[in-house]
């Protein structure tokens, strides 16, 4: 029974297949399994016995137990063997053509499949004799078939890539075992194995199997075809075929190798049968091949076909075929060396191998056809599929070729892939890349001339010829460098408390902020009490709840205590405010008494001073806060400000506590995810009220605890360096430890700078007097505020002036009372101006109270003050004290300011070496950035501005950017040790606009060398004074601070010659050279540099940064001058100054010399207007050369210094030149002081040369100003102050910048580092600062294209300068060679292109104009060569274009669509349709709207103001997204250069919307051009990703910075159509000529070989006479050549004599021979004349360069050789039947001269085309035109037939005498009458006749 069941089971399973394995294999597998069978043993034994019996009967169906044996073996094998690949595939079932999903598992030589992976039973297939192939030509469904001797499976993969993976895995599973199992050896084995690569196909004609020789089955002859050699087999015969595919290497040639003396010969490789239609035998020229059987042969290389009988007569060597130049012969590839490259032996002759990469997926899988076609034409080893192998394998194999070409058959993305691999292998110099367009866009192929698409592979041989004749051009490639601000998403909860408790905690913080705001803003007592009580309860509850969850956290406990203390201080401030409010005027006295009792005396030997490592104690902090309160109470509303400070302090403490309770959260996310970002409280202020701002200290937290708001994220994106150092610092780092910073890098607000010793003493009038002493530079003495040396142990009342030190910050101010600022060490200097103005107002108010009965005008006050100063020049100043911010030091002596009615000169460089913010340098007008922001953005009116009824002020300050101000890059100026001070509202408003980082840049006192604002006004008549006036701001600092002090001169001199690294100095610090326009002598000064901080990895500052300073005294002199005042001048005409300087002062003084151009005329004009008692006194000025040969620098105020209107300029005003010696930080000689003052009347100008010691004096109110900038200033500009400051010109900007040409030339040549933001983004300094001499013509300035910079001044100045100097030379037009990049579109300057910020207006202009100054503190010193790309990585390489915005969004959507539905994107037309649909979608959605708010664009370092746009495109080639010329034209114009891909220039255009992108495909748009530049930077702001595409490949880019830099250049092959036409015409001519010679020679030979009469015909006789003439002439001139040059070869003379003797033998005694003997004799003549011709040509070719021939001899010899060549072509020597050689002449050779007869063209046609006589001489002869064909003879018609390979109809055409005229009129019926019956032949002849007629 059991046996029957088994049989029944087997019968049911048998129809699944007839595959049977041998019994032996069944036994071996059963025995090797080693497991117990679940079925009984007896059936298994019987099974084996039955199998042995049926061993020879494979078709017997009785094998009962075989199924069980196979299943058990499969299960055990699956558990033991290694799996190569597994996964699901679709298996084709033969019933109803359905597909089933099956799980396949591939192992070594075995394939298993089942329904799913969990099945225990798998069907197995033995792969020992495997054949696999693709199903179909295009193979759209990614199917392949597996054929073994027993099974055949059709499988389908999801994608072509997966199919390629399975085929590769099958190849690996069946490949022999090798020591190295990498993919390269697998591909190498595939290349060298000569195995066929099958694919299933059908045939249109009968085809026969190359294995069994039978016809393929079916009407369509369906079978398998090898994609390389076109071998045809049945599917059942594929496994039996031998490996005789096309050869690849010398080893694969095998036994067919032919070796000769010259080397290895390339033999033919024959394939039998299945010849193409109308194949002709290469030997007998007859048709071969058959559709009836497999016969005849074809060569796989040269494509020659021969009969079986003719094959032995075929030449042995294979000519390789039409693509010989591109083919790598297998005989040249010997082996693969150890470096995975071929050992190549270059073949003889021309050889330019072609490496082909084909993307089989491109063009709707068109790449598959091209891949197979290329393998058929070329060596299969030089054709690679990018999908399966990639470019690396082919490039490695071709590495040893000296030069080769690469053809990439794909789209732009694959081209970029190949070029990237070329970069990796560094093979730019040895390869040239061509592109065959198979993709959708193909922009690069369009530009290179290869068209938009290539779909037909039938003309591939002709296409290869085009690539062989291509020319080479260089393609620029650009690196896309990306600096991403990656923010990881936190995975854990950010706080240790639960979510509910976190919400409660957030509510508490919000409530506390609410109550704090009520406390600060309310005026209601009840509300104040209620909010205070609620605040205390909330803080207590908050502290309790947080402490419960963090009981063991000691730091948190400390922070909670700090919070309670700050809350108590807030309550104390409230109490003080209430006391002051009720006590009225007693408030100040009460506060003074409290402060006096609370401040302890600080001893000189403080523990902090002795040990800098000890942090600042709490008492010191309280002392600072008390002092600040004491100072702030002297102003109106100071109580509110103090209360505001305390509230902000409490708020910050709350934030610190909450942040510390979130240890798991990154610091930059803590505040964002839990509570709102910290925002300082502000005082409510009316718009018209002037709120005093006395405190400069920041109210925002330090940089390391700033939340990543929008503002800060924008700024962090600007810095090219990663912000890990800033973000990684603990927020409490500076709270707990006070690091000992080096003095050069010390923070001015920390005690780690220069230590301060404070002493308090009681003054004579009962006031408390503070005296501060500071350690001297050498450490040997202490210096007080007045600059006097103090003994280390001096008492309070002792002050011995032992040594005078240099004043680096001295600001003398006229006032009557000393104002002491004890907090100067803890404040930056940016609100110094405001503090001074407020103090001045207070002083003026006191003076007015004292002098109520005597109204005094301001001018008289000032004159009186000046007179007092002049009367006591040597008197020591009693009320001199240090002015640190915000205190004011009062000094009555303005020694560096001269004011008059016509001009005011201020020296801001002299010893004011402290680094200042941009807010310090501007005065009463709205030229300050802070003032501008306060005017336009803030509700707080700053006291920087004049009040509404105030007169015009001249109290502006120009910041001094001395390069000696060393600043640590990460200097902790924002330490929490500095408490928030009053006056924070204005800074909050700034921070809301600029962001916290820029606000810190404003508050920091460490700016670099980038002053950007110049203020000046032309001297004019005095304006009426306003009611109120603010005096000029002045500064003093008696103690030199280490950080800001200028080193002594001798230290610089000693270091001058020892600096070997010039790159360490800032390139703006080099003092620029400016010519003196009024003096012939040009003075120079040696360059001065600023030292950079040296950094080492892992540390902050290297030892090299700390340089020891030395002091050396220099001798100097005192210059005294008195300047009498003019009697009738209403304003101050001069200042009586006595500059008493010490030796140390002289070492750092700056001399300013102002000279009058045309001084004689000026003096004459002045004398006529002045009274006789006017005295002009000038001090003796030494030689301009001073110091150690140091030259004086001279700045000229020429026409560029006129005011902007240029209307009311007095032509009598002389030109003023300023000679400056700016202080040098490291190098330079001593500068001797020069004092020379010349007061003049208001109607004229004046000359001033004065010594400035760093002090600023009072200027006249109504005087014009001329300000001298330090060496970092970009140039000199003029600012016009309007009477009404609110009414300005449309293009007026008080912060306008202009560049002096000399300064620009200096900047462009400077190589070193800078802290400029604008220069830091430059990639080479000289690329962004062009020579401004070319500014007017090319509009390619650094600032051209923006209305922020007044180039009208520069243009006018240049024009006037040319007129003055009399330069009337004609200037040549500016071409592209003279244009400097970047070239900015002038449209950018128009109003419709808004400014950088959306708000626009004055604020944006100020921000951009002062960008370098604002960002200096947060910008590290950037070296353009070293730190430029720090933190960047190369994302990709751009070859075509870069897009950000809408175009990238469309490309990204298309890419996602193609990945999701590949079947919808398989044709080019469908892809274009999808692009249109997605573009229309963007028209409605506008996902990239307002892109200008999210990105910033810089071109060559210049910030470009962007309009409202949706995208930015950067073009390298003039083709964009499918052939659009998005630039708008391909030619140059007045502004831009012509676009090209080999000029290292990028074109930047704007994309305003999808409508514009669509319209640009139809018309050329040019309004959207932005710039042409050499480098681009794009800053992505915000937190969202933005779509970006490069060459059509799109992705989403996170926020950060993108830089596009030039990477390299690659050689590209461009189509050369002119060369193609020339080669085509030449080849056509050669083919016709050779065919004609062969036909005539064969016909003549056959005609005369059979005839008995060997007499030369009459026509031949005519040719013979021409031949004799040519030989005679050649012999004559060759003999004459040898005689003229005896040094030449004598054997040539012998050859000439032999030819002459042979020639004499055919016409003895002047008569030609007759009969057959003539032809025999002619053979000798022909041979000797040919030898003479060859030897003569060889001699001239070898020795022609050294021969000096006479002109007539050279001409005649050349003509003789040319005639001889033509005559030899007409001769032929043939062997007759009798064995003799006879000569024959070709009388039917075509005439090479073109028919000169042409139809006369009309007169107007000839006139329009011009003279064509010279042009026609160079045109090739047109032999296939209608005119030429109309004159053809019968023989020429026959030649025409033979060129079309239709020689079988020659006899019919000869018989009917068909000439050219009849040929052009032949029709289909006529051809039938002539015997042309084949339809294909009729069509070919008719088409050829049509072509002739059309030509």
Curated annotation (Swiss-Prot):
Residues 1832-1895 form the SAM domain. Its EC number is 2.7.1.107. Residues 1-10, 1113-1128 have a biased composition (Basic and acidic residues). GO terms for cellular component: cytoplasm; plasma membrane. Keywords: ATP-binding, Cytoplasm, Kinase, Metal-binding, Nucleotide-binding, Phosphoprotein, Repeat, Transferase, Zinc, Zinc-finger. Phosphorylates diacylglycerol (DAG) to generate phosphatidic acid (PA). This is Diacylglycerol kinase eta. It comes from Drosophila melanogaster (Fruit fly).
């Amino acid at each position: 029974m059991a046996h029957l069941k088994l049989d029944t089971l087997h019968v049911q399973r048998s129809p699944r297949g007839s595959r049977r394995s041998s019994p032996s294999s069944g036994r071996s597998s059963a025995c090797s399994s080693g497991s117990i069978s679940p079925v009984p043993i007896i059936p298994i034994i019987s099974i084996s016995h039955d199998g042995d019996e049926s061993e020879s009967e494979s078709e017997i169906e009785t094998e009962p137990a075989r199924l069980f044996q196979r299943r058990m073996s499969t299960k055990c094998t699956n558990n033991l063997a290694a799996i190569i690949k597994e996964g699901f595939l679709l298996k084709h079932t033969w019933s109803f053509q359905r597909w089933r999903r099956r799980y396949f598992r591939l192992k070594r030589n075995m394939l298993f499949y089942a329904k799913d992976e969990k099945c225990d039973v798998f069907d197995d297939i033995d792969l020992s004799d495997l054949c696999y192939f693709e199903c179909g030509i295009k193979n759209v469904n990614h199917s392949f078939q597996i054929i073994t001797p027993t099974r055949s499976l059709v499988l389908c993969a999801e994608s072509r890539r997966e199919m390629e993976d399975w085929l590769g895995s099958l190849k690996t599973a069946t490949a022999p075992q090798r020591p190295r199992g990498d993919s390269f050896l697998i591909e190498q084995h595939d290349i060298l194995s000569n195995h066929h690569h099958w694919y299933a196909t059908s045939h249109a004609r009968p085809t026969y199997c190359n294995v069994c020789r039978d016809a393929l089955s079916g009407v369509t002859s369906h079978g398998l075809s090898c994609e390389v050699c076109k071998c045809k087999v049945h599917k059942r015969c594929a496994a039996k075929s031998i490996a005789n595919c096309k050869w690849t290497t010398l080893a694969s040639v095998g036994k067919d190798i032919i070796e000769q003396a010259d080397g290895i010969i390339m033999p033919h490789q024959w394939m039998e049968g299945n010849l193409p239609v109308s194949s002709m035998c290469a030997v007998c020229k007859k048709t071969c091949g058959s559709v009836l059987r497999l016969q005849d042969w074809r060569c796989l290389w040269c494509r020659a076909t021969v009969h079986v009988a003719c094959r032995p007569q075929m030449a042995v060597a294979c000519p390789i075929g039409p693509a010989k130049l591109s083919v790598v012969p297998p005989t040249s590839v010997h082996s693969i060396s150890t470096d995975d490259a071929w050992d190549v032996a270059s073949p003889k002759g021309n050889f330019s191998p072609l490496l082909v990469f084909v993307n089989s997926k491109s063009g709707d899988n068109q790449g598959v056809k091209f891949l197979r076609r290329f393998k058929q034409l070329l060596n299969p080893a030089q054709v690679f599929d990018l999908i399966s192998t990639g470019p690396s394998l082919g490039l490695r194999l071709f590495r040893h070729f000296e030069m080769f070409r690469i053809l990439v058959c794909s789209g732009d993305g694959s081209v970029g892939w190949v070029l990237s691999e070329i970069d990796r292998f560094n093979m730019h110099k040895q390869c040239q890349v061509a592109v065959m367009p198979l993709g959708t866009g193909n922009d690069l192929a369009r530009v290179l001339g290869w068209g938009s698409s290539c779909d037909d592979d039938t003309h591939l041989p002709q296409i290869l010829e085009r690539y062989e004749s291509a020319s080479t051009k260089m393609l620029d490639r650009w690196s896309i460098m990306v600096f991403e601000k990656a923010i990881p998403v936190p995975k854990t909860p950010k706080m240790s408390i639960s979510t509910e408790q976190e919400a409660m905690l957030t509510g508490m913080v919000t409530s506390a902020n609410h109550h704090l705001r009520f406390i600060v803003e309310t005026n209601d007592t009840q509300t104040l009490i209620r909010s205070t009580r609620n605040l205390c309860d909330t803080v207590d509850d908050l502290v309790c709840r947080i402490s419960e969850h963090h009981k063991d956290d000691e730091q948190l406990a400390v922070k909670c205590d700090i919070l309670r203390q700050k809350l108590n201080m807030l309550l104390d401030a409230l109490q003080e405010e209430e006391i002051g409010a009720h006590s009225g005027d007693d408030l100040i006295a009460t506060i003074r008494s409290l402060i006096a009792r609370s401040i302890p005396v600080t001893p000189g030997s403080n523990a902090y001073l002795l040990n800098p490592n000890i942090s600042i104690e709490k008492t010191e902090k309280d002392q600072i806060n008390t002092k600040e309160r004491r100072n702030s109470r002297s102003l109106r509303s100071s109580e509110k400000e103090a209360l505001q400070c305390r509230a902000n302090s409490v708020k910050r403490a709350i934030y610190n506590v909450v942040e510390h309770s979130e240890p798991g959260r990154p610091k930059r996310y803590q505040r964002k995810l839990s509570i709102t970002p910290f925002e300082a409280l502000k005082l409510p202020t009316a718009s018209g009220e002037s709120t005093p701002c006395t405190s400069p200290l920041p109210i925002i937290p330090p940089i390391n605890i700033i939340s990543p708001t929008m503002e800060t994220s924008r700024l962090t994106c600007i810095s090219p360096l990663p912000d890990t150092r800033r973000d990684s610092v603990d927020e409490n780092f500076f709270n707990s430890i006070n690091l000992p910073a080096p003095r050069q890098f010390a923070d001015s607000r920390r005690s780690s700078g220069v230590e301060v010793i404070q002493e308090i003493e009681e003054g004579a009038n009962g006031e408390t007097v503070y005296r501060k002493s500071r350690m001297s530079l050498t450490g040997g003495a202490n210096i007080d505020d007045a600059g006097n040396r103090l003994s280390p142990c001096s008492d309070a009342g002792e002050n011995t002036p032992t040594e005078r030190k240099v004043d680096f910050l001295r600001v003398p101010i006229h006032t009557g009372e000393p104002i002491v600022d004890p907090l100067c060490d803890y404040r930056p200097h940016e609100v110094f101006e405001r503090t001074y103005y407020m103090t001045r107002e207070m002083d003026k108010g006191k003076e007015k109270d004292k002098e109520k009965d005597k109204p005094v005008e301001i001018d008289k006050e000032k004159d009186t003050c000046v007179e007092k100063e002049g009367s006591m020049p040597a008197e020591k100043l009693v009320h001199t004290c240090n002015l640190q911010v915000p205190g004011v030091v009062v000094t009555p002596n303005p020694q560096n300011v001269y004011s008059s009615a016509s001009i005011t000169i201020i020296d801001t460089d002299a010893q004011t070496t402290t680094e200042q913010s941009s807010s310090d340098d501007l005065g009463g007008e709205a030229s300050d950035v802070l003032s501008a922001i306060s005017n336009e953005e803030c509700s707080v009116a700053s006291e920087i501005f004049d009040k509404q009824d105030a007169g015009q002020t001249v109290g502006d300050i120009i910041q001094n950017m001395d390069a000696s101000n060393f600043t640590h890059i990460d200097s902790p100026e924002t330490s929490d040790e500095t408490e928030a001070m009053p006056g924070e509202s204005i800074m909050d408003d700034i921070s809301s606009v600029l962001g916290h980082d820029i606000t810190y840049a404003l508050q920091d006192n460490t700016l670099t060398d980038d002053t950007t604002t110049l203020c000046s006004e032309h001297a004019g008549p005095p304006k009426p004074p306003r009611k109120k006036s603010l005096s000029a701001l002045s500064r003093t600092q008696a103690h030199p601070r280490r950080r800001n002090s200028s080193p002594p001169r001798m230290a610089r001199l000693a270091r001058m010659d020892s600096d070997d690294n010039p790159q360490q100095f800032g390139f703006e610090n080099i003092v620029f050279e400016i010519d003196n326009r009024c003096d012939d002598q040009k003075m120079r000064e040696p360059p001065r540099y600023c030292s950079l901080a040296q950094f080492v990895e892992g540390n902050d500052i290297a030892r090299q940064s700390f340089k020891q300073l030395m002091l050396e005294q220099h001798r100097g002199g005192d210059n005294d001058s008195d300047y009498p005042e003019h009697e009738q001048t209403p304003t101050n005409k001069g200042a009586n100054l006595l500059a008493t300087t010490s030796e140390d002062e002289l070492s750092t003084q700056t001399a300013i010399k102002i000279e009058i151009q045309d001084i004689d005329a000026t003096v004459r004009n002045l004398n006529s207007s002045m009274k006789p008692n006017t005295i002009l006194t000038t001090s003796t000025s030494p030689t301009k050369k001073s110091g150690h040969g140091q030259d004086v620098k001279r700045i000229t105020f020429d026409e560029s210094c006129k005011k902007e209107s240029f209307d009311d300029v007095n032509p009598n005003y002389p030109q003023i030149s300023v000679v400056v010696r700016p202080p040098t930080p490291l190098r330079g000689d001593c500068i001797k002081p020069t004092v020379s003052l010349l007061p003049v009347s208001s109607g004229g100008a004046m000359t001033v040369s004065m010594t400035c010691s760093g002090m600023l004096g009072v200027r006249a109110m109504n005087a014009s100003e001329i300000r001298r900038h330090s060496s970092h200033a970009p140039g000199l500009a003029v600012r016009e102050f309007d009477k009404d400051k609110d009414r300005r010109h449309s293009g007026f900007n008080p912060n306008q910048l202009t560049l002096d040409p000399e300064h620009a030339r200096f900047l462009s040549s400077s190589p070193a580092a800078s802290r400029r933001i604008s220069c830091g983004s430059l990639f080479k300094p000289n690329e962004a600062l062009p020579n401004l001499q070319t500014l007017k013509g090319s509009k390619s300035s650094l600032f051209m294209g923006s209305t922020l910079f007044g180039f009208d001044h520069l243009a006018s100045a240049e024009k006037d300068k040319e007129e003055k100097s009399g330069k009337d030379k004609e200037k040549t037009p500016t071409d592209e060679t003279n244009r400097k990049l970047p070239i900015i579109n002038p449209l950018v300057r128009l109003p419709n292109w808004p400014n950088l910020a959306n708000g626009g207006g004055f604020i944006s202009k100020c921000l951009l104009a002062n960008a370098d100054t604002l960002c200096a503190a947060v910008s590290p010193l950037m070296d353009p060569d070293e730190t430029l790309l720090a933190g960047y990585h190369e994302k990709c390489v751009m070859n075509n274009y870069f897009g950000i915005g809408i175009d990238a969004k469309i490309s990204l959507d298309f890419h996602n669509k193609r990945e999701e539905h590949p079947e919808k994107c398989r044709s080019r037309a469908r892809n274009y349709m999808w692009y249109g649909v997605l573009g229309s979608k963007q028209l409605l959605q506008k996902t990239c709207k307002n892109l200008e708010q999210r990105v910033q664009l810089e071109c060559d370092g210049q910030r470009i103001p962007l309009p409202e746009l949706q995208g930015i495109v950067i073009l390298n080639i003039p083709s964009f997204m499918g052939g659009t010329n998005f630039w708008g034209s391909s030619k140059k114009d007045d502004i831009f250069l012509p676009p090209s891909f080999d000029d290292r220039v990028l074109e930047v255009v704007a994309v305003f919307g999808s409508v514009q992108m669509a319209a640009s495909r139809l018309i050329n748009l040019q309004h959207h051009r932005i710039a042409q530049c050499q480098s681009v930077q794009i800053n992505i702001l915000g937190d969202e990703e933005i779509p970006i595409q490069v060459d059509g490949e799109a992705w989403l880019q996170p926020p950060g910075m993108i830089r596009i830099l030039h990477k390299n250049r690659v050689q590209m092959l461009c189509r050369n159509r002119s060369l193609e036409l020339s080669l085509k015409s030449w080849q056509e001519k050669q083919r016709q000529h050779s065919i004609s010679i062969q036909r005539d020679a064969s016909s003549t030979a056959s005609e005369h070989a059979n005839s008995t009469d060997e007499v030369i015909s009459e026509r031949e006789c005519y040719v013979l006479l021409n031949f004799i003439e040519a030989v005679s002439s050649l012999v004559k001139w060759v003999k004459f050549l040898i005689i003229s040059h005896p040094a030449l070869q004598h054997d040539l003379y012998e050859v000439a004599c032999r030819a002459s003797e042979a020639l004499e033998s055919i016409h003895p005694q002047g008569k030609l021979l007759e009969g057959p003997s003539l032809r025999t004799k002619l053979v000798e003549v022909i041979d000797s004349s040919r030898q003479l011709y060859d030897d003569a040509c060889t001699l001239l070719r070898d020795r022609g360069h050294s021969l000096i021939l006479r002109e007539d001899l050279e001409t005649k010899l050349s003509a003789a050789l040319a005639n001889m060549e033509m005559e030899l072509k007409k001769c032929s020597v043939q062997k007759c039947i009798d064995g003799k050689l006879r000569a024959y002449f070709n009388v039917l050779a075509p005439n090479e001269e073109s028919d000169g007869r042409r139809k006369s063209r009309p007169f107007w046609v000839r006139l329009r085309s011009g003279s064509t006589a010279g042009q026609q001489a160079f045109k090739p002869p047109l032999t296939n035109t209608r005119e030429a064909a109309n004159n053809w003879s019968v023989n020429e018609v026959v030649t025409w037939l033979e060129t079309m390979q239709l020689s079988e109809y020659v006899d019919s055409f000869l018989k009917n005498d068909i000439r050219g005229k009849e040929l052009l009129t032949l029709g289909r019926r006529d051809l039938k009458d002539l015997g042309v019956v084949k339809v294909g032949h009729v069509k070919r002849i008719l088409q050829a006749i049509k072509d002739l007629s059309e030509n």
